[in-house]
Protein backbone atom coordinates (compact mmCIF):
# COMPACT_ATOMS: atom_id res chain seq x y z
CA UNK A 1 0.00 0.00 0.00
CA UNK A 2 2.97 2.33 0.50
CA UNK A 3 6.48 2.73 -0.85
CA UNK A 4 7.63 4.39 2.38
CA UNK A 5 10.52 2.19 3.59
CA UNK A 6 10.10 3.30 7.20
CA UNK A 7 6.52 2.06 7.34
CA UNK A 8 6.88 -1.32 5.65
CA UNK A 9 6.04 -4.43 7.69
CA UNK A 10 5.28 -6.78 4.81
CA UNK A 11 8.20 -9.16 4.40
CA UNK A 12 7.01 -10.04 0.90
CA UNK A 13 7.29 -6.37 -0.06
CA UNK A 14 10.91 -6.22 1.12
CA UNK A 15 12.04 -7.70 -2.21
CA UNK A 16 10.42 -4.76 -4.01
CA UNK A 17 12.11 -2.23 -1.73
CA UNK A 18 15.51 -3.86 -2.27
CA UNK A 19 15.03 -3.51 -6.02
CA UNK A 20 14.02 0.16 -5.79
CA UNK A 21 16.27 1.46 -3.02
CA UNK A 22 19.82 0.87 -1.88
CA UNK A 23 21.25 1.30 1.61
CA UNK A 24 24.80 1.96 2.76
CA UNK A 25 25.49 -1.75 2.36
CA UNK A 26 23.63 -4.27 0.23
CA UNK A 27 23.13 -7.98 -0.35
CA UNK A 28 23.98 -9.42 -3.73
CA UNK A 29 24.53 -12.73 -5.51
CA UNK A 30 27.97 -14.21 -4.88
CA UNK A 31 27.85 -16.00 -8.22
CA UNK A 32 26.69 -19.34 -6.82
CA UNK A 33 23.18 -18.35 -5.83
CA UNK A 34 24.14 -17.41 -2.28
CA UNK A 35 23.76 -13.94 -0.79
CA UNK A 36 26.86 -11.96 0.15
CA UNK A 37 27.33 -8.59 1.83
CA UNK A 38 28.91 -5.86 -0.27
CA UNK A 39 29.16 -2.08 -0.40
CA UNK A 40 26.08 -0.18 -1.48
CA UNK A 41 25.80 3.61 -1.42
CA UNK A 42 28.89 3.64 0.81
CA UNK A 43 32.10 2.95 -1.08
CA UNK A 44 33.92 2.57 2.26
CA UNK A 45 33.57 3.12 5.99
CA UNK A 46 35.68 3.39 9.14
CA UNK A 47 34.92 2.32 12.70
CA UNK A 48 36.33 3.97 15.84
CA UNK A 49 35.75 3.15 19.51
CA UNK A 50 35.55 6.31 21.61
CA UNK A 51 36.82 6.90 25.16
CA UNK A 52 33.30 6.65 26.59
CA UNK A 53 32.57 3.28 25.01
CA UNK A 54 30.52 4.67 22.14
CA UNK A 55 31.42 3.66 18.59
CA UNK A 56 31.55 6.02 15.62
CA UNK A 57 31.16 4.93 12.00
CA UNK A 58 32.05 7.22 9.09
CA UNK A 59 30.61 6.25 5.72
CA UNK A 60 31.98 7.76 2.53
CA UNK A 61 29.29 7.75 -0.15
CA UNK A 62 30.01 6.97 -3.78
CA UNK A 63 30.50 10.08 -5.88
CA UNK A 64 28.45 8.35 -8.59
CA UNK A 65 25.44 7.61 -6.33
CA UNK A 66 22.33 9.16 -7.88
CA UNK A 67 18.58 9.20 -7.42
CA UNK A 68 16.53 8.11 -10.42
CA UNK A 69 15.83 11.78 -11.29
CA UNK A 70 19.57 12.47 -11.52
CA UNK A 71 19.97 14.22 -8.15
CA UNK A 72 22.99 13.21 -6.09
CA UNK A 73 22.52 10.90 -3.10
CA UNK A 74 23.91 12.82 -0.12
CA UNK A 75 24.72 12.15 3.52
CA UNK A 76 21.78 14.35 4.49
CA UNK A 77 19.44 11.86 2.80
CA UNK A 78 20.56 9.29 5.37
CA UNK A 79 20.47 11.77 8.27
CA UNK A 80 16.92 12.71 7.36
CA UNK A 81 15.76 9.09 6.93
CA UNK A 82 17.29 7.84 10.19
CA UNK A 83 16.04 10.76 12.28
CA UNK A 84 12.59 10.38 10.75
CA UNK A 85 12.61 6.65 11.56
CA UNK A 86 13.42 7.31 15.24
CA UNK A 87 10.96 10.20 15.56
CA UNK A 88 7.83 9.15 17.56
CA UNK A 89 5.76 11.42 15.29
CA UNK A 90 6.53 9.15 12.32
CA UNK A 91 5.01 6.21 14.21
CA UNK A 92 7.16 3.73 12.34
CA UNK A 93 6.76 0.10 13.41
CA UNK A 94 10.48 -0.30 12.69
CA UNK A 95 11.81 2.47 14.95
CA UNK A 96 13.63 -0.01 17.22
CA UNK A 97 16.26 -0.41 14.49
CA UNK A 98 17.57 2.95 15.70
CA UNK A 99 17.84 1.81 19.33
CA UNK A 100 21.56 1.10 18.91
CA UNK A 101 22.25 4.71 17.86
CA UNK A 102 23.27 7.15 20.62
CA UNK A 103 20.48 9.56 21.49
CA UNK A 104 17.67 7.20 20.51
CA UNK A 105 16.14 7.07 23.99
CA UNK A 106 16.11 10.88 24.18
CA UNK A 107 14.38 11.08 20.82
CA UNK A 108 11.69 8.66 21.95
CA UNK A 109 11.20 10.49 25.25
CA UNK A 110 11.27 14.09 24.02
CA UNK A 111 10.27 13.86 20.37
CA UNK A 112 13.38 15.86 19.43
CA UNK A 113 14.77 13.85 16.52
CA UNK A 114 17.88 16.05 16.38
CA UNK A 115 19.09 14.21 19.49
CA UNK A 116 19.85 11.14 17.38
CA UNK A 117 23.62 10.99 16.88
CA UNK A 118 23.72 10.97 13.10
CA UNK A 119 25.19 13.77 11.04
CA UNK A 120 26.50 14.81 7.64
CA UNK A 121 30.10 15.99 7.90
CA UNK A 122 29.77 16.99 4.26
CA UNK A 123 27.53 15.86 1.43
CA UNK A 124 29.51 12.63 0.99
CA UNK A 125 30.27 11.72 4.63
CA UNK A 126 27.59 10.19 6.85
CA UNK A 127 28.57 9.87 10.53
CA UNK A 128 26.81 7.60 13.04
CA UNK A 129 27.64 7.16 16.73
CA UNK A 130 26.37 4.03 18.47
CA UNK A 131 25.80 3.97 22.22
CA UNK A 132 27.78 0.70 22.43
CA UNK A 133 29.36 -1.84 20.07
CA UNK A 134 26.76 -3.59 17.91
CA UNK A 135 27.67 -6.87 16.25
CA UNK A 136 24.91 -6.63 13.64
CA UNK A 137 25.11 -2.92 12.78
CA UNK A 138 26.77 -3.20 9.37
CA UNK A 139 25.04 -6.35 8.14
CA UNK A 140 21.69 -5.80 9.84
CA UNK A 141 20.99 -2.09 10.28
CA UNK A 142 22.86 -0.80 7.24
CA UNK A 143 21.06 -3.14 4.84
CA UNK A 144 17.54 -2.88 6.31
CA UNK A 145 14.62 -1.58 4.29
CA UNK A 146 13.54 0.87 6.99
CA UNK A 147 16.94 2.63 7.05
CA UNK A 148 17.08 3.30 3.30
CA UNK A 149 17.83 6.95 2.39
CA UNK A 150 15.01 9.38 1.69
CA UNK A 151 14.79 12.74 -0.03
CA UNK A 152 13.57 15.42 2.37
CA UNK A 153 12.04 17.47 -0.46
CA UNK A 154 9.92 14.54 -1.66
CA UNK A 155 9.00 13.00 1.68
CA UNK A 156 7.75 15.73 3.98
CA UNK A 157 4.50 16.32 2.10
CA UNK A 158 3.97 12.58 1.57
CA UNK A 159 3.66 12.91 -2.20
CA UNK A 160 7.00 11.21 -2.84
CA UNK A 161 5.55 7.77 -2.16
CA UNK A 162 2.81 7.96 -4.80
CA UNK A 163 2.92 7.92 -8.57
CA UNK A 164 4.15 9.77 -10.52
CA UNK A 165 6.43 11.26 -7.86
CA UNK A 166 8.27 8.12 -6.72
CA UNK A 167 12.03 8.61 -6.91
CA UNK A 168 14.44 5.89 -5.78
CA UNK A 169 18.19 5.28 -5.64
CA UNK A 170 18.38 1.55 -6.35
CA UNK A 171 18.91 -0.51 -9.47
CA UNK A 172 15.29 0.04 -10.55
CA UNK A 173 12.64 2.73 -10.36
CA UNK A 174 8.86 2.51 -10.58
CA UNK A 175 7.32 3.04 -14.02
CA UNK A 176 3.77 1.89 -13.25
CA UNK A 177 1.88 0.86 -10.13
CA UNK A 178 -1.60 -0.53 -9.68
CA UNK A 179 -1.77 -1.06 -5.93
CA UNK A 180 -4.08 -4.04 -6.09
CA UNK A 181 -2.47 -5.92 -8.95
CA UNK A 182 1.03 -5.05 -10.18
CA UNK A 183 4.09 -2.84 -9.82
CA UNK A 184 6.40 -2.44 -12.80
CA UNK A 185 9.99 -1.30 -12.29
CA UNK A 186 12.48 -0.45 -15.01
CA UNK A 187 16.23 -0.19 -14.97
CA UNK A 188 17.45 3.01 -13.27
CA UNK A 189 19.87 4.46 -15.80
CA UNK A 190 21.26 6.74 -13.07
CA UNK A 191 22.33 3.74 -10.96
CA UNK A 192 26.11 3.52 -10.62
CA UNK A 193 26.15 -0.11 -11.84
CA UNK A 194 23.29 0.19 -14.34
CA UNK A 195 25.23 -1.68 -17.02
CA UNK A 196 25.56 -4.71 -14.72
CA UNK A 197 21.87 -4.94 -13.84
CA UNK A 198 20.15 -7.98 -15.35
CA UNK A 199 16.55 -7.54 -16.59
CA UNK A 200 15.54 -4.24 -18.17
CA UNK A 201 12.19 -4.56 -16.41
CA UNK A 202 10.75 -6.29 -13.35
CA UNK A 203 7.04 -6.92 -12.89
CA UNK A 204 5.83 -7.67 -9.37
CA UNK A 205 2.39 -9.29 -9.59
CA UNK A 206 0.27 -9.22 -6.43
CA UNK A 207 -1.58 -12.55 -6.45
CA UNK A 208 -4.31 -13.28 -3.93
CA UNK A 209 -2.42 -16.35 -2.76
CA UNK A 210 0.09 -19.02 -3.72
CA UNK A 211 -2.50 -21.07 -5.64
CA UNK A 212 -3.30 -18.11 -7.91
CA UNK A 213 0.43 -17.43 -8.33
CA UNK A 214 0.95 -21.05 -9.39
CA UNK A 215 -1.75 -20.75 -12.05
CA UNK A 216 -0.05 -17.62 -13.38
CA UNK A 217 3.27 -19.48 -13.47
CA UNK A 218 1.80 -22.46 -15.30
CA UNK A 219 0.19 -20.09 -17.80
CA UNK A 220 3.56 -18.47 -18.48
CA UNK A 221 2.46 -15.10 -17.11
CA UNK A 222 5.16 -14.95 -14.43
CA UNK A 223 8.67 -16.39 -14.22
CA UNK A 224 9.22 -16.59 -10.46
CA UNK A 225 7.12 -17.60 -7.46
CA UNK A 226 8.31 -16.51 -4.02
CA UNK A 227 5.96 -18.93 -2.19
CA UNK A 228 4.86 -22.18 -3.77
CA UNK A 229 1.43 -23.55 -2.82
CA UNK A 230 1.17 -26.42 -0.34
CA UNK A 231 0.10 -28.86 -3.05
CA UNK A 232 3.29 -28.28 -5.04
CA UNK A 233 5.47 -28.32 -1.92
CA UNK A 234 3.94 -31.63 -0.85
CA UNK A 235 4.90 -33.10 -4.22
CA UNK A 236 8.43 -31.71 -4.05
CA UNK A 237 8.88 -33.04 -0.50
CA UNK A 238 8.56 -36.60 -1.80
CA UNK A 239 12.06 -36.17 -3.24
CA UNK A 240 14.47 -37.02 -0.41
CA UNK A 241 17.03 -34.60 -1.86
CA UNK A 242 14.63 -31.65 -1.75
CA UNK A 243 14.96 -29.18 1.08
CA UNK A 244 12.85 -26.09 1.83
CA UNK A 245 14.49 -22.70 2.24
CA UNK A 246 14.65 -21.76 5.91
CA UNK A 247 13.59 -18.25 6.87
CA UNK A 248 14.23 -16.33 10.06
CA UNK A 249 10.90 -16.90 11.77
CA UNK A 250 9.69 -19.12 14.60
CA UNK A 251 6.02 -19.93 15.14
CA UNK A 252 5.32 -19.76 18.87
CA UNK A 253 2.55 -20.27 21.37
CA UNK A 254 2.44 -17.16 23.55
CA UNK A 255 1.16 -17.26 27.13
CA UNK A 256 -0.19 -14.19 28.90
CA UNK A 257 1.84 -14.37 32.11
CA UNK A 258 -0.61 -12.06 33.88
CA UNK A 259 -3.68 -14.19 33.17
CA UNK A 260 -5.17 -16.18 36.03
CA UNK A 261 -4.12 -19.48 34.47
CA UNK A 262 -0.86 -18.84 32.67
CA UNK A 263 0.74 -16.90 35.48
CA UNK A 264 1.29 -20.43 36.84
CA UNK A 265 4.52 -21.93 35.49
CA UNK A 266 3.21 -25.50 35.91
CA UNK A 267 0.31 -24.76 33.57
CA UNK A 268 2.61 -23.18 30.99
CA UNK A 269 4.87 -26.21 31.23
CA UNK A 270 1.95 -28.60 30.85
CA UNK A 271 0.82 -26.88 27.66
CA UNK A 272 4.38 -26.83 26.32
CA UNK A 273 5.03 -30.49 27.09
CA UNK A 274 1.82 -31.50 25.33
CA UNK A 275 2.96 -30.05 21.99
CA UNK A 276 4.12 -32.49 19.32
CA UNK A 277 6.27 -30.07 17.36
CA UNK A 278 6.79 -32.36 14.38
CA UNK A 279 3.05 -32.81 13.96
CA UNK A 280 2.38 -29.09 14.37
CA UNK A 281 5.07 -28.21 11.81
CA UNK A 282 3.61 -30.69 9.33
CA UNK A 283 0.15 -29.21 9.84
CA UNK A 284 1.53 -25.84 8.79
CA UNK A 285 3.14 -27.21 5.63
CA UNK A 286 5.99 -29.40 4.39
CA UNK A 287 8.29 -26.37 4.27
CA UNK A 288 8.31 -26.03 8.07
CA UNK A 289 10.62 -27.83 10.51
CA UNK A 290 10.03 -28.58 14.21
CA UNK A 291 11.51 -25.95 16.53
CA UNK A 292 14.34 -27.17 18.74
CA UNK A 293 14.86 -23.70 20.23
CA UNK A 294 13.58 -20.15 19.89
CA UNK A 295 16.31 -18.74 17.63
CA UNK A 296 15.87 -20.38 14.21
CA UNK A 297 18.48 -22.05 12.05
CA UNK A 298 20.72 -19.83 9.94
CA UNK A 299 21.24 -17.03 12.44
CA UNK A 300 25.02 -16.57 12.87
CA UNK A 301 26.80 -17.44 16.09
CA UNK A 302 29.99 -15.78 17.38
CA UNK A 303 31.90 -16.17 14.13
CA UNK A 304 34.57 -18.44 15.65
CA UNK A 305 33.14 -21.42 13.76
CA UNK A 306 30.90 -21.96 10.76
CA UNK A 307 28.13 -23.25 13.03
CA UNK A 308 25.03 -21.11 13.41
CA UNK A 309 23.45 -20.04 16.70
CA UNK A 310 20.97 -22.93 16.69
CA UNK A 311 23.64 -25.57 16.13
CA UNK A 312 25.83 -24.17 18.91
CA UNK A 313 22.86 -23.74 21.25
CA UNK A 314 21.79 -27.33 20.72
CA UNK A 315 18.40 -28.95 21.05
CA UNK A 316 16.39 -27.25 23.80
CA UNK A 317 13.26 -29.22 22.93
CA UNK A 318 13.63 -32.76 21.63
CA UNK A 319 11.48 -33.78 18.69
CA UNK A 320 12.33 -37.49 19.01
CA UNK A 321 9.07 -39.49 19.09
CA UNK A 322 9.94 -41.34 22.31
CA UNK A 323 10.87 -38.09 24.04
CA UNK A 324 7.63 -36.48 22.86
CA UNK A 325 5.57 -39.36 24.28
CA UNK A 326 7.39 -39.12 27.61
CA UNK A 327 6.91 -35.37 27.74
CA UNK A 328 3.21 -35.68 27.05
CA UNK A 329 2.84 -38.07 30.00
CA UNK A 330 4.73 -35.57 32.14
CA UNK A 331 2.40 -32.79 30.96
CA UNK A 332 -0.54 -34.32 32.82
CA UNK A 333 1.50 -34.36 36.02
CA UNK A 334 2.28 -30.66 35.65
CA UNK A 335 -1.42 -29.83 35.62
CA UNK A 336 -1.86 -31.72 38.87
CA UNK A 337 1.03 -29.74 40.41
CA UNK A 338 -0.97 -26.62 39.56
CA UNK A 339 -3.94 -28.01 41.50
CA UNK A 340 -5.93 -29.40 38.59
CA UNK A 341 -6.22 -33.04 39.63
CA UNK A 342 -9.16 -33.58 37.31
CA UNK A 343 -9.45 -32.20 33.79
CA UNK A 344 -13.04 -31.24 34.55
CA UNK A 345 -11.65 -28.65 36.95
CA UNK A 346 -9.81 -26.79 34.17
CA UNK A 347 -11.88 -23.97 32.61
CA UNK A 348 -12.31 -23.60 28.83
CA UNK A 349 -9.73 -21.27 27.31
CA UNK A 350 -9.24 -19.51 23.97
CA UNK A 351 -6.39 -19.67 21.45
CA UNK A 352 -6.07 -16.40 19.52
CA UNK A 353 -4.56 -16.37 16.03
CA UNK A 354 -4.77 -14.70 12.62
CA UNK A 355 -7.06 -16.72 10.39
CA UNK A 356 -6.85 -17.32 6.66
CA UNK A 357 -3.28 -18.67 6.77
CA UNK A 358 -1.51 -21.87 7.78
CA UNK A 359 -2.43 -20.82 11.32
CA UNK A 360 -5.87 -22.39 10.85
CA UNK A 361 -4.41 -25.89 10.49
CA UNK A 362 -1.74 -25.36 13.14
CA UNK A 363 -4.26 -24.02 15.66
CA UNK A 364 -6.52 -27.03 15.07
CA UNK A 365 -3.56 -29.38 15.56
CA UNK A 366 -2.60 -27.68 18.84
CA UNK A 367 -6.21 -27.78 20.01
CA UNK A 368 -6.27 -31.54 19.42
CA UNK A 369 -2.95 -32.08 21.22
CA UNK A 370 -4.06 -30.19 24.31
CA UNK A 371 -7.42 -31.94 24.31
CA UNK A 372 -5.96 -35.42 23.83
CA UNK A 373 -3.02 -35.06 26.22
CA UNK A 374 -4.41 -32.75 28.90
CA UNK A 375 -8.14 -33.22 28.49
CA UNK A 376 -8.69 -29.46 28.41
CA UNK A 377 -11.09 -27.51 26.21
CA UNK A 378 -9.40 -24.98 23.93
CA UNK A 379 -11.66 -22.83 21.77
CA UNK A 380 -10.19 -21.51 18.53
CA UNK A 381 -10.49 -17.78 17.92
CA UNK A 382 -9.34 -16.89 14.41
CA UNK A 383 -9.46 -13.15 13.75
CA UNK A 384 -8.21 -10.57 11.28
CA UNK A 385 -4.68 -9.20 11.57
CA UNK A 386 -6.04 -5.86 12.78
CA UNK A 387 -8.12 -7.44 15.55
CA UNK A 388 -5.23 -9.70 16.52
CA UNK A 389 -2.86 -6.75 16.83
CA UNK A 390 -5.35 -4.78 18.91
CA UNK A 391 -5.98 -7.62 21.33
CA UNK A 392 -2.29 -8.45 21.70
CA UNK A 393 -1.35 -4.83 22.37
CA UNK A 394 -4.11 -4.64 24.99
CA UNK A 395 -2.87 -7.97 26.46
CA UNK A 396 -6.44 -9.19 26.03
CA UNK A 397 -5.77 -12.90 25.51
CA UNK A 398 -4.77 -16.09 27.31
CA UNK A 399 -3.08 -18.12 24.57
CA UNK A 400 -1.95 -16.86 21.18
CA UNK A 401 -0.23 -18.25 18.11
CA UNK A 402 2.29 -15.94 16.45
CA UNK A 403 5.35 -16.03 14.22
CA UNK A 404 8.31 -14.34 15.86
CA UNK A 405 10.62 -12.59 13.41
CA UNK A 406 13.54 -10.18 13.66
CA UNK A 407 14.50 -7.02 11.82
CA UNK A 408 18.12 -8.20 11.48
CA UNK A 409 19.96 -11.53 11.31
CA UNK A 410 21.20 -11.74 14.88
CA UNK A 411 19.99 -13.77 17.86
CA UNK A 412 19.43 -10.52 19.76
CA UNK A 413 16.50 -9.78 17.45
CA UNK A 414 14.70 -12.87 18.77
CA UNK A 415 15.71 -12.45 22.41
CA UNK A 416 15.62 -8.79 23.46
CA UNK A 417 11.86 -8.57 22.81
CA UNK A 418 11.22 -10.52 26.04
CA UNK A 419 12.89 -7.94 28.30
CA UNK A 420 10.58 -6.45 30.93
CA UNK A 421 10.44 -2.97 29.39
CA UNK A 422 10.37 -4.00 25.73
CA UNK A 423 7.44 -2.73 23.65
CA UNK A 424 7.47 -6.12 21.91
CA UNK A 425 7.01 -8.05 25.16
CA UNK A 426 3.35 -8.92 24.65
CA UNK A 427 3.36 -11.82 27.13
CA UNK A 428 4.04 -9.81 30.34
CA UNK A 429 7.16 -11.87 31.02
CA UNK A 430 9.40 -10.38 33.72
CA UNK A 431 12.72 -11.76 34.90
CA UNK A 432 15.35 -9.36 36.22
CA UNK A 433 18.16 -11.82 35.59
CA UNK A 434 17.06 -12.19 31.98
CA UNK A 435 17.07 -8.41 31.58
CA UNK A 436 20.63 -8.29 32.93
CA UNK A 437 21.81 -11.04 30.56
CA UNK A 438 20.43 -9.20 27.54
CA UNK A 439 21.86 -5.89 28.78
CA UNK A 440 25.32 -7.35 29.31
CA UNK A 441 25.23 -9.05 25.91
CA UNK A 442 24.20 -5.79 24.24
CA UNK A 443 27.13 -3.93 25.80
CA UNK A 444 29.76 -6.64 25.26
CA UNK A 445 32.64 -5.92 22.90
CA UNK A 446 33.71 -9.58 22.94
CA UNK A 447 31.66 -11.49 20.37
CA UNK A 448 32.28 -14.87 21.99
CA UNK A 449 31.20 -13.62 25.42
CA UNK A 450 28.23 -11.80 23.89
CA UNK A 451 27.02 -14.95 22.19
CA UNK A 452 27.45 -16.98 25.39
CA UNK A 453 25.20 -14.52 27.24
CA UNK A 454 22.59 -14.83 24.49
CA UNK A 455 22.67 -18.63 24.70
CA UNK A 456 22.15 -18.36 28.47
CA UNK A 457 19.23 -16.00 27.88
CA UNK A 458 17.57 -18.38 25.44
CA UNK A 459 17.93 -21.23 27.92
CA UNK A 460 16.35 -19.08 30.63
CA UNK A 461 13.29 -18.48 28.45
CA UNK A 462 12.84 -22.24 28.23
CA UNK A 463 13.39 -22.72 31.96
CA UNK A 464 10.67 -20.14 32.63
CA UNK A 465 8.35 -21.47 29.92
CA UNK A 466 8.04 -17.91 28.62
CA UNK A 467 6.85 -18.62 25.05
CA UNK A 468 6.70 -22.10 23.48
CA UNK A 469 8.49 -22.31 20.11
CA UNK A 470 6.59 -24.70 17.85
CA UNK A 471 8.24 -24.73 14.43
CA UNK A 472 10.77 -22.90 12.29
CA UNK A 473 9.22 -21.28 9.24
CA UNK A 474 10.30 -22.20 5.76
CA UNK A 475 9.43 -21.36 2.20
CA UNK A 476 9.85 -22.76 -1.27
CA UNK A 477 10.29 -20.70 -4.42
CA UNK A 478 10.67 -21.47 -8.09
CA UNK A 479 12.39 -19.71 -11.00
CA UNK A 480 11.61 -20.71 -14.56
CA UNK A 481 14.40 -22.95 -15.82
CA UNK A 482 15.16 -20.64 -18.74
CA UNK A 483 16.48 -18.11 -16.21
CA UNK A 484 19.07 -18.05 -13.45
CA UNK A 485 20.45 -15.62 -10.89
CA UNK A 486 17.71 -15.03 -8.29
CA UNK A 487 19.14 -15.31 -4.79
CA UNK A 488 17.30 -15.22 -1.46
CA UNK A 489 18.35 -14.37 2.08
CA UNK A 490 17.22 -15.70 5.44
CA UNK A 491 14.36 -13.22 5.62
CA UNK A 492 12.87 -14.59 2.42
CA UNK A 493 13.91 -11.53 0.40
CA UNK A 494 14.60 -12.20 -3.27
CA UNK A 495 17.20 -10.25 -5.24
CA UNK A 496 16.79 -9.89 -9.00
CA UNK A 497 19.63 -7.69 -10.27
CA UNK A 498 21.67 -10.78 -11.16
CA UNK A 499 18.98 -12.52 -13.22
CA UNK A 500 20.22 -13.71 -16.61
CA UNK A 501 19.00 -16.02 -19.38
CA UNK A 502 20.12 -19.55 -18.61
CA UNK A 503 22.49 -20.67 -21.37
CA UNK A 504 23.34 -24.06 -19.83
What are these model-predicted stretches?
Residues 1-50, 167:
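N-terminal lobe/hinge region of extracytoplasmic solute-binding protein
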Residues 44-97, 127, 218-219, 261-263:
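Aromatic- and charge-enriched surface segment that lines or borders ligand/interaction sites
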Residues 58-60, 77-79, 90-151:
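Surface-exposed binding/hinge segments that line
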Residues 274-305, 357-367, 391-504:
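Detector for C-terminal structural segments
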Residues 288-337, 358-360:
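Structural transition elements
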Residues 321-406, 475:
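Ligand/substrate-recognition segments at binding pockets and active sites
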Amino acid sequence: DSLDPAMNTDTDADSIFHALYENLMRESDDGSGEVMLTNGMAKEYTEETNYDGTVTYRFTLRSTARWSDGEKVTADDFVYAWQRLADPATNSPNHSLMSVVAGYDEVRETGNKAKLQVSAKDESTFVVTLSAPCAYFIEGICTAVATMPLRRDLTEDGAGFDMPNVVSNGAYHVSAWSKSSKLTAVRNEEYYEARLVGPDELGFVFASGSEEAWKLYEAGDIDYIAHLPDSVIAELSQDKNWKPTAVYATACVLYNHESDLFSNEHIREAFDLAIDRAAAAAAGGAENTPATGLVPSGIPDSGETDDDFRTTGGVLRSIDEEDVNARQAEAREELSYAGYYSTSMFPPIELLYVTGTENDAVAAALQNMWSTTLGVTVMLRGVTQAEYNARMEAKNYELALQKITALYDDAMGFLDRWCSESEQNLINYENGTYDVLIGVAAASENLVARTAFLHDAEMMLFDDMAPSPVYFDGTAHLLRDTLRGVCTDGFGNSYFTGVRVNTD
